[in-house]
A protein has these predicted regions:
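Short, Arg/Lys-rich segments that mark the N-terminal edge of DNA/RNA- and chromatin-recognition modules
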Residues: 1-31, 78-174
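Conserved aromatic
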Residues: 33-36
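An aromatic-rich alpha-helical recognition segment common to small helix-rich domains
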Residues: 19, 39-47
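Intrinsically disordered, low-complexity charged/polar segments
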Residues: 53-85
């Protein structure tokens, strides 16, 4: 077995491969793969992300092929800020970014960090929500905005960025 890889078996007997890495005494799962080579490649990509300071959020796409974008963001945040979150969160000065996808960055105040660290944001038909104890809550509800509210009429984004959910950027009109 190659470094960072171990085999496992599904209930139907199919063999698959798990990749993991240990960094600063933290054991991190990198995912499941159908081949040992893919799992080892994911391990090598993770090593590169954690060791190479030249890799940033701006050039990360050229560095990953086997790792998911979410996992790569988690690893970069752990390397740069020494905090590991299971969700794709990257800490900034005074706020944090939550990457819903590789082209959708949501910005939040640092006050909301531990809420979103424990709740995965999902998007369905343009609506952003989190699941909490079986219920789905719009992320706008944290700002007192009703589910039926309309942007521009019931609430505004001061800087025009509809992905910037910092409290100073949202004006709740109704």
């Amino acid at each position: 077995m190659q470094t960072g890889v171990y085999s496992a078996q599904k209930k139907d007997g199919t063999v698959y491969y798990r990749a993991n890495i240990t960094y600063q005494t933290k054991h991190i799962s990198l995912g499941s793969f159908s081949s040992e080579e893919d799992a080892h490649s994911a391990y090598l990509e993770a090593c590169n992300l954690l060791e190479n300071e030249a890799v940033t959020l701006f050039n990360i796409h050229s560095q990953i092929r086997h790792l998911s974008f979410d996992k790569a963001v988690c690893l970069l945040n752990f390397r740069d800020n020494h905090l590991y979150f299971h969700n794709p969160i990257y800490l900034r000065k005074g706020y944090f970014s939550y990457f819903l996808s590789d082209d959708m960055e949501l910005k939040f105040d640092i006050d909301d960090l531990f809420y979103y660290a424990g709740h995965r944001i999902q998007k369905r038909q343009g609506h952003l929500f989190v699941s909490d104890y079986g219920m789905q809550y719009s992320i706008l509800s944290r700002y007192g905005i009703k589910p039926y509210a309309v942007t521009g009429r019931d609430y505004l984004f001061f800087n025009g960025d509809t992905h910037d959910f910092r409290y100073s950027n949202i004006l709740n009109i109704n």
